[in-house]
Amino acid sequence: MINKFVINYILLSYMGLCFLYGCTRAEKCNIKGHFPGSIPFYIDLYNINTGEKVFSDSLNTNDFNLPIKILPKGIYQAVFSWKRDLLRPQDIERFSRQPELGVPKYFLSTTFWLDNEEANEYNLSFDKVYNQDELEEILFNQVADEPTHMWVKSNGLNNKLYCQYLDLLDGFKHKNRHQKDSLQQVENYYIEHKMYDEAKIVSATLREPWLDLVKNELITQEILFMKKHISSDVIIQIYNFQVNSKQDFERYIKVYNSFPSNIKQVLDRRLRHFME
């Protein structure tokens, strides 16, 4: 009888400890990694849906492990910044006119899906090992449509899916940049041979963020990706980011039609004026 009582007591104690441990784990998650920027550097975390800054810190070591309070699941942007030693003429001019904006900095950001019910640990990851000089050279010469070099990864299925989507985007950004480089050579040829009307047409094309053929191909692949994973919470947020006009709604109509009726009812509150 005593042995049975002792066993039950041990089991209940164990269950209690497990419960308490589970509650402790649920209070926060962690973002960790190695960032090769100049010390000190800064990290800011934003909720993409609301634009709210939900976390901010300055770090004096390249290796970090930061506890983050429990946040609503969704897509977040992690922004890393640090002081710039190398400035362009336009940077100096901007600072002289608007010193209140502060000294120019390097910025590197990425987005990721955060859900502590899926994962409590999020790891900063780069496409290769960079030192500070290499990273700053990339950022100094970077154009807006170049692929990202940084991700925040976890074991959560939704974040893995979101990283797949980022890889899809990066592939088309690279393709867009490559084809623009080829068009730039065509423009240079026209100018060299005084074919200014032709050069003007090419120049107008190059000013657009995306080449039409590449953009259309990207949208096709986005639609296939979203339809394939239509039941994921990630897809609803991606769809919301992409559809901001009647034209967007028509472009992604196949995705909308694939959502179950309960999701459509939620989306319709925002999209109803695009459906008219």
Question: What is the meaning of each model-derived region?
Answer:
Residues 12-16, 21, 83, 119, ...:
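Residue-level detector of solvent-exposed, low-hydrophobicity positions
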Residues 195, 201-276:
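Charged, long alpha-helical assembly modules
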